[in-house]
Amino acid sequence: MDQINQEFFDAAARGDFEKVCSMVSKGANVNVANGDGRTALMRSAKRGYDNIVRYLLDNGADVRARDKNNKTALMGAAKKGHLEICRMLEHAGADVNSHDNKGRTALMRAALLGETEVVNYLIGKGADVNAKDEEGRTALMEATTAYKLEEMKSLLDAGADVNAVDNKGCTALMRAAYIGYPELIRFLIEHGADKTLKDYQGNLAIHYVRKECFEDLQGLLK
């Protein structure tokens, strides 16, 4: 990467809007990527720099570019909960169902680490609520792991399979049982979670309960 492109890339990464504009006017390539395949759009989207994202898109940034792990700008923005940036990227043509090398989508990232409004936005734009990553995990499983009841409700209302299993036969209810919060377990059961399902080792959800939580949870899971 030459000096102009390096200065442009660094400016985008730190949120220096004026410097970004200056470097583009001097010939910087808006789609230049670093050694990991990350572009200025990816960096600024993940860090929440709305004005830079808008400028880059207006000046030809590739909204579908992928880094060496096949991650996109939308995935980064969704993970960090940047709703307005997610909107800009989707409007510019970002694929809400693209997945990285591990099969993970923007919705999965938002369900685990992002914000309810981003989850709702992605669902509204057609994100597949039952997509699975390479380990068989779904967005609902991720939201369960993060104890995010609002996200879980949004996913279930959109048709997420409450009894989906990962590659080990583990369900969202089994994850909730291990985490140990009665409200989480009760919520899933009320939405159709089957406590009689077994994983591929023959374990029921109740077998995932840790010893210190068993007394509080056994009544819900028996």
Locate the predicted segments by residue.
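Conserved ankyrin/ankyrin-like repeat signature
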Residues: 19, 51-52, 84-85, 117-118, ...
